[in-house]
């Protein structure tokens, strides 16, 4: 005995803990380890065992036999089907058992017999159908029993009644029709939702219980019919009746249910469940069953081990269900089964172990399914099979190895399959020649030479392979059938040539053996998953150049690990996502030239590790901070072949100011956001379904290549035309049953392929004149069930393809303007005779289809209630002489006259405009420029700014910190406590208390915890990132930046490489001329004179002077930014130009106790003037200045008055009346522009000198004080500002670039430049550029009914030559002899004129030619 004891002590601790688990202080955690069975070597003294989130399928009798001390067992989220009746017999101290979210179908009797101390049992979300007393007996003090979301139709309650401690019983989502009241239970929670309750006398107890409970209003009756849908708690007892037969029929036991499952019938040893609406295979089947009939149900899946106890079963019929999945070993245990009927289902695939255990099977019917192949090993387990029907599937070929064990096969049905009768099916033809097993009349589909030939009549020598045909079906036993060469293309070797074939889409049937795919010179617009390029794993070269591609799905090239060359040049790409490149990409050559790409994300270049040649010339690359990723990549790959346009004017170094400057640039154009499916929606095969998803707005992230979009049954009230018109491939759009009010002009203008548009049952009141502009392909339009009164003819003028239109159930106003519609639908026969007139009364209820022209008259005025449907301004909503401007059918803007504000200009600007009173206090004007605040309860102070302290008598416990609220307080608890007063202690490692950081795993230990850290972290709470820079030395002065299990060397300017080992590149700027080298242009560009050694300076934005050394503008974008100038005189004028889109921000501040301040509030200038006469005087500008355009602001102080003028608007005056008559400060104060120092801002806000102390976000320029221009480089203090405004405002606001686009450019004096389209020039792109080009291409030459044998190089002249007097024409041609082939089979030689040179020539008139 002593020897044994010593041996136990010598066993290492790790030997008693399974390798997949973590064992800490009697707790064993094996969560998420993909375990398929309960691990061995679990310590015997374990108290808690966590096995959730694994793949365990069964619990054996001895799995927990040694764990007698176990108190908590977690087995949820596994695949458990089987539990032995002795599985838990040793767990005598078990208190909590969770078996939820498994696949348990049946509980053994007495399974919990020894678990007397069990208090919590969770069996929810399984497939249990019957729960009997014998299954539940054992526990004596059960408190919680969860049975939610099973298929329970019978529940015995004798054991449940005996549990006087039972507080929670959940039965939601089952199939219970009745449940007898448990006699002794005192439920705290009883959940009964979603059961088909039969509300008779037996449920009166339930009604009384629900009447007292709260939140149980979803418990409704299913039967009898007169009570269907009624909430049980509101019924009266007199309606809940029972007949005598029903009372006698009710039994308190599930014994009969165990014998024969509902709703089946059992006769002898046959179980008949035909046409019973079953959605799953019944579990409680009698063991003596020999035949089961389950045909014509709704079963979709056959789980593993579904029939394992039915050893006597000989026939099983599962035909005419909707089975899509047969799980592995589904029929295991059916050793005597000789007939299996599976025809008429939706089975697409069979696993190799699907029929394991069916050694006696003789007849197998798999006809009328959707099988595409037969895998290797599928029939290895059925050696006695004599009859196999695969009739009416989609099988193309069968490998010989698949049938090698079917030695007894005598009958095979293969008809109605698209068989490929090539060399890979010759083996079957040889067997059929010997045994004649194929008797169904199967025919060949491919190759073309054998199409429609009967399989049984073809000799084996006809089954041949030509060229690459042997590759097509070579791997049929792996369910892979390759494609033949597309009809539009030519295939030679492994090259597929589809160049210049006029293709609109990529052929979907490209063979996988292709190594080169050439698709140049077509009309392809999208590259999506439908093209199947992503499956061409052998592809090495892909040429998609010279197409119209605007969109590439992120996963289109995902699996092309062998792709070395990708050509996408000369397309219309605006974005190239890094998602297109796989992490393991071997791409070496990438051509993106001639697109519309503006920039690339840094992630893209992180993946482009093997690219040695890249071309992006001819794109719209932005020469600003967004080109940094490309510049950085170039520095690290300078030896590579690059074809990239230089950005001569953009300079960047790695200093802090440049980093901050570039950090603020917008990233939208460079983002890597892929084309995902919208939230809540489903996307499949370019069809997006968002029906009935409670959407309140048009969803984002809809794939650009979507063809069908379903948005019906939502709450959408507006269609964003910009987002919708990106979906240019859309053919069907369903917006019915929403809350749309109007259709605006050009809402669908880009949807040129849309054929069906359904907008029925909305709240449409208005169609704008161009509502359906662009819908030339529309055939079906439904506007039924709306509130439309007018149908403008112009809205329907583009509907040239319309065949059906529905406008019934609308409030149509049929005056003379509706006559056209009646005439139109009569001539086109497109309306079904449902639409009727509602107004005027003279034609009320008149069918439009049968109305006569004389009935449509304009004799009376249109009622205002109808006219305002499309123009709300007719109601004159704007006040105080404001001008109403209609912006859409249901929207308008009131342009207020100066001095008024509000949606309808109903309010006059006064001292209370800025809501100066805090905490919802009431503001009342006392006199011009002054106000009083009337506080709400709980506040006090001049501005009601002080909150009365409610923490004086707080009841916070356990170290909780009291936080004062309004008329209340809250307790901020320490980490381990919760509750209103921190009175409840939390358990560690729960959702509410997990101290482990950085994804560390929390393990509870006797009231405390331990953290198991993720790789890269350490510390008690995994709070410390392990320093990966410890042994790293960055070169050339670089500094190491620690990451998570990684590091980066932050290099000095010009250096690159992993360790900053790559020296700086050569200066890429053009060499300056001698004259410019001696210049000092400061913040500008030197322009040398061509005729002398002199030069001039072209200043950058924000600078002026002969040497560009005077700073005239300053940008504000950083927190705490400000400029400090010399003190302001008591009486003086300061003028500035402001550009901003912000609603708030400091403009200027001067003073201490006495002050003048100007700030933005709601986009207006708020001026506060105080010279010592309390209270301060307030004034707001009558106009807003935050529209992004430049505004000239002038502020003048003179004694008690302060004057404000914005642009050329009238001067506004505010007076601080009282004894003091001049603005005098205590000390020498600076004049602050754009913001305040932190201490000054806090003080100014505390004393209500300013409402908001944030710095301005925008630009201030051309500052003058008393008409003297200020050089901002001479400011006393300059903190966190920008030298110019290019990074803070949009200088393109309000700029019209005509035939081009405006881009911000810090190097331009005006801050912007117009980038003209290819055929235009000039400062604003309003001058057409003279240009005549020869455009070359390769195509067939056509003459009458003859075509050239080969494609030939030809050209056309295109361009603009300055007007009608000149034209772009060919001035040099050559002749070429070309061989032609004609439709009648003859050939000839034709002479073709090939253009060699194009230029502008005078236009020849017809008269001059004569």
Swiss-Prot record:
Its main location: secreted. Disulfide bonds join 873-884, 878-894, 896-905, 912-923, 917-933, 935-944, 951-962, 956-971, 973-982, 989-1002, 996-1011, 1013-1022, 1029-1040, 1034-1049, 1051-1060, 1076-1086, 1081-1097, 1099-1108, 1259-1285, 1292-1302, 1297-1314, 1316-1325, 1332-1368, 1346-1382, 1357-1398, 1361-1400. Residues 195-243, 417-466, 619-671, 810-859 form the LRRCT domain. Keywords: Developmental protein, Disulfide bond, EGF-like domain, Leucine-rich repeat, Repeat, Secreted, Signal. Residues 17-43, 259-286, 484-511, 677-703 form the LRRNT domain. The keyword Signal applies. GO terms for molecular function: calcium ion binding; heparin binding; Roundabout binding; signaling receptor binding. One of its GO terms (cellular component) is extracellular region. Residues 871-906, 908-945, 947-983, 985-1023, 1025-1061, 1072-1109, 1288-1326 form the EGF-like domain. SUPFAM superfamilies: Concanavalin A-like lectins/glucanases, EGF/Laminin, L domain-like. It is found in: Secreted. Residues 1-16 form the signal peptide. LRR repeats lie at residues 22-42, 43-66, 67-90, 91-114, 116-138, 140-162, 163-186, 219-242, 286-309, 310-333, 335-357, 358-381, 383-405, 407-430, 442-465, 489-510, 511-535, 536-559, 561-583, 585-607, 681-703, 704-726, 727-750, 752-774, 775-798, 800-823, 1197-1221. The keyword Repeat applies. Residues 1332-1406 form the CTCK domain. PROSITE patterns: ASX_HYDROXYL, CTCK_2, EGF_1, EGF_2, EGF_3, EGF_CA, LAM_G_DOMAIN, LRR. It comes from the Eukaryota. GO terms for biological process: axon midline choice point recognition; dorsal/ventral axon guidance; negative regulation of axon extension involved in axon guidance; neuron migration; regulation of sensory neuron axon guidance; sensory neuron axon guidance. Interacts with eva-1. Functions as a ligand for sax-3 receptor during larval development. Acts via the sax-3/Robo receptor to direct ventral axon guidance and guidance at the midline during embryonic development. This is Slit homolog 1 protein. The lineage of its organism: Eukaryota, Metazoa, Ecdysozoa, Nematoda, Chromadorea.
């Amino acid at each position: 005995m002593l020897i044994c004891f010593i041996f136990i002590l010598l066993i290492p601790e790790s030997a008693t803990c399974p390798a997949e688990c973590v064992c800490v202080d009697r707790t064993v955690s094996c969560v998420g380890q993909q375990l398929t069975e309960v691990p061995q070597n679990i310590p015997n003294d374990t108290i808690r065992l966590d096995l959730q989130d694994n793949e365990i399928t069964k619990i054996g009798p001895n799995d927990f036999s040694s764990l007698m001390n176990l108190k908590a067992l977690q087995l949820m989220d596994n695949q458990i089907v089987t539990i032995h009746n002795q599985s838990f017999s040793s767990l005598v101290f078990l208190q909590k058992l969770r078996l939820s979210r498994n696949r348990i179908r049946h509980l053994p009797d007495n399974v919990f017999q020894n678990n007397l101390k069990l208090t919590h049992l969770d069996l929810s979300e399984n497939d249990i159908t019957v729960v009997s007393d014998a299954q539940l007996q054992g526990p004596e003090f059960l408190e919680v029993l969860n049975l939610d979301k099973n298929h329970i139709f019978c529940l015995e309650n004798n054991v449940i009644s005996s549990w006087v401690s039972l507080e929670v019983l959940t039965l939601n989502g089952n199939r219970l029709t009745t449940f007898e009241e448990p006699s002794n239970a005192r439920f705290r929670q009883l959940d009964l939702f979603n059961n088909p309750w039969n509300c008779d006398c037996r449920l009166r107890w339930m009604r009384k219980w629900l009447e007292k409970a709260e939140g149980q209003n979803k418990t409704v009756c299913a039967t009898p019919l007169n009570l269907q849908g009624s909430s049980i708690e509101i019924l009266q007892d007199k309606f809940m009746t029972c007949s005598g037969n029903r009372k006698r029929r009710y039994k308190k036991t599930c014994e009969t249910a165990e014998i024969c499952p509902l709703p089946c019938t059992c006769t002898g040893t046959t179980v008949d469940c035909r046409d019973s609406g079953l959605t799953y295979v019944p579990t409680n089947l009698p063991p003596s069953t020999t035949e089961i009939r389950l045909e014509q149900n709704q079963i979709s899946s056959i789980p593993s081990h579904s029939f394992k106890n039915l050893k006597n079963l000989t026939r099983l019929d599962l035909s005419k269900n909707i089975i899509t999945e047969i799980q592995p070993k589904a029929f295991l245990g059916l050793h005597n089964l000789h007939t299996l009927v599976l025809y008429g289902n939706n089975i697409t695939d069979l696993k190799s172990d699907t029929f394991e255990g069916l050694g006696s099977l003789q007849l197998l019917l798999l006809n009328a399914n959707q099988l595409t192949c037969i895998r290797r090993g599928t029939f290895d387990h059925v050696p006695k099979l004599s009859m196999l029907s695969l009739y009416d599937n989609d099988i193309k070929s069968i490998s010989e190895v698949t049938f090698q064990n079917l030695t007894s096969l005598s009958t095979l049905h293969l008809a109605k399959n698209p068989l490929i009768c090539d060399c890979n099916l010759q083996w079957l033809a040889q067997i059929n020649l010997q045994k004649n097993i194929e008797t169904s009349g199967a025919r060949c589909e491919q190759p073309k030479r054998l199409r429609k030939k009967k399989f049984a009549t073809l000799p084996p020598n006809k089954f041949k392979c030509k060229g690459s045909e042997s590759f097509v079906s070579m791997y049929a036993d792996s369910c892979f059938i390759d494609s033949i060469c597309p009809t539009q293309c030519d295939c030679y070797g492994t090259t597929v040539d589809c160049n210049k074939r006029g293709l609109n889409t990529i052929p979907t049937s490209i063979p996988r053996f292709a190594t080169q795919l050439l698709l140049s010179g077509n009309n392809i617009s999208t590259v999506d998953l439908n093209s199947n390029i992503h499956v061409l794993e052998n592809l090495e070269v892909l040429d998609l150049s010279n197409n119209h591609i605007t969109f590439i799905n992120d996963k289109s090239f995902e699996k092309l690990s062998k792709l070395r060359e990708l050509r996408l040049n000369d397309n219309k790409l605006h974005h190239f996502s890094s998602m297109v490149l796989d992490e393991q990409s071997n791409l070496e050559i990438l051509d993106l030239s001639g697109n519309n790409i503006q920039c690339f994300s840094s992630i893209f270049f992180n993946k482009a590790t093997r690219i040695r040649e890249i071309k992006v010339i001819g794109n719209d690359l932005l020469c600003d901070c967004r080109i940094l990723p490309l510049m950085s990549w170039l520095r690290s790959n300078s030896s590579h072949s690059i074809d990239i346009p230089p950005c001569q004017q953009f300079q960047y170094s790695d200093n802090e100011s440049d980093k901050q400057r570039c950090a603020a640039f917008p990233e939208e154009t460079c983002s890597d956001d892929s084309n995902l499916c919208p939230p809540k929606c489903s996307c499949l095969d370019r069809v997006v379904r968002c029906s009935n998803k409670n959407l309140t707005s048009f969803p984002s992230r809809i794939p650009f290549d979507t063809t069908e979009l379903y948005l019906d049954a939502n709450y959408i009230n507006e269609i964003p035309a910009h987002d919708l018109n990106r979906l240019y491939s859309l053919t069907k759009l369903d917006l019915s049953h929403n809350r749309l009010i109007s259709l605006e002009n050009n809402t669908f203008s880009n949807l040129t392929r849309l054929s069906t548009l359904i907008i029925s049952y909305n709240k449409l009141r208005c169609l704008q004149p161009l509502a359906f502009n662009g819908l030339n392909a529309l055939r079906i339009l439904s506007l039924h069930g709306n509130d439309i009164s007018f149908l403008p003819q112009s809205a329907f003028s583009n509907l040239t393809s319309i065949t059906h239109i529905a406008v019934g159930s609308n409030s149509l106003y049929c005056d003379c303007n509706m006559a056209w519609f009646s005439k139109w639908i009569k001539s086109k026969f497109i309306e079904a005779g449902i639409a009727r007139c509602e107004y005027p009364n003279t034609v009320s209820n008149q069918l439009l289809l049968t109305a006569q022209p004389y009935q449509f008259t304009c004799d009376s005025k249109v009622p205002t209630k109808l006219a305002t449907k499309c123009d709300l301004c007719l109601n004159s909503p704007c006040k105080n002489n404001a001008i109403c401007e209609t912006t859409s059918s249901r929207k308008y803007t009131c342009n207020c006259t100066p001095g008024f504000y509000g949606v309808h200009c109903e309010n006059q600007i006064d001292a209370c405009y800025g809501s100066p009173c805090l905490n919802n206090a009431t503001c009342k004007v006392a006199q011009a420029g002054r106000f009083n605040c009337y506080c709400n309860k709980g506040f006090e102070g001049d501005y009601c700014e002080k909150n009365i302290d409610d923490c004086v008598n707080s009841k916070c416990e356990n170290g909780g910190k009291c936080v004062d609220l309004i008329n209340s307080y809250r307790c901020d608890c320490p980490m381990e406590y919760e509750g209103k007063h921190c009175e409840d202690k939390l358990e560690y490692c729960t959702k509410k208390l997990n101290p482990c950081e950085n994804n560390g795993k929390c393990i509870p230990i006797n009231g405390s915890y331990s953290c198991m850290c993720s790789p890269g972290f350490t510390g008690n709470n995994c709070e410390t990132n392990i320093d990966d820079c410890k042994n790293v030395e960055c070169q050339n002065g670089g500094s190491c930046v620690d990451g998570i299990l990684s590091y980066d060397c932050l290099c000095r300017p010009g250096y690159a490489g992993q360790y900053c080992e790559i020296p700086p590149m050569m200066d890429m700027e053009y060499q300056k001329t001698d004259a410019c080298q001696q210049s000092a242009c400061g913040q500008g560009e030197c322009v040398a004179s061509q005729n002398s050694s002199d030069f001039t300076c072209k200043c950058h934005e924000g600078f002026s002077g002969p040497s560009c050394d005077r700073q005239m503008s300053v940008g504000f974008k950083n927190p705490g930014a400000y400029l400090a100038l010399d003190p302001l005189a008591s009486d003086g004028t300061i003028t500035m130009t402001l550009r901003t889109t912000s609603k708030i921000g400091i403009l200027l501040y001067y003073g201490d106790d006495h002050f003048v301040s100007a700030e933005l509030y709601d986009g207006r200038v708020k001026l506060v003037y105080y010279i010592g006469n309390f209270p301060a005087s307030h004034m707001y500008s009558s106009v807003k200045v935050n529209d992004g355009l430049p505004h000239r602001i002038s502020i003048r102080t003179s004694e008690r008055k302060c004057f404000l003028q914005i642009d050329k608007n009238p001067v506004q005056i505010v007076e601080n009346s009282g004894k003091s008559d001049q603005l005098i400060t205590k000390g020498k104060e600076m004049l602050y522009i754009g913001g305040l120092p932190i201490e000054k801002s806090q003080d100014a806000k505390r004393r209500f000198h300013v409402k908001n102390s944030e710095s301005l976000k925008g630009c201030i320029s051309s500052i003058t004080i008393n008409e003297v221009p200020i050089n901002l480089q001479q400011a006393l203090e300059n903190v966190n500002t920008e030298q110019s405004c290019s990074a803070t405002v949009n200088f393109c606001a309000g700029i019209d670039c005509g035939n081009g686009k405006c881009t911000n450019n810090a190097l331009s004096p005006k801050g912007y430049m117009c980038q003209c389209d290819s055929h235009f020039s000039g400062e604003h792109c309003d001058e057409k550029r003279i240009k005549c080009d020869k455009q070359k291409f390769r195509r067939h030459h056509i003459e009458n009914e003859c075509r050239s044998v080969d494609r030939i190089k030809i050209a056309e002249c295109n361009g603009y030559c300055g007007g009608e007097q000149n034209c772009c024409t060919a001035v040099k041609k050559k002749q070429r002899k070309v061989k032609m082939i004609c439709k009648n089979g003859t050939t000839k030689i034709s002479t073709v004129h090939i253009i060699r040179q194009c230029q502008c020539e005078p236009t020849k008139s017809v008269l001059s030619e004569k």
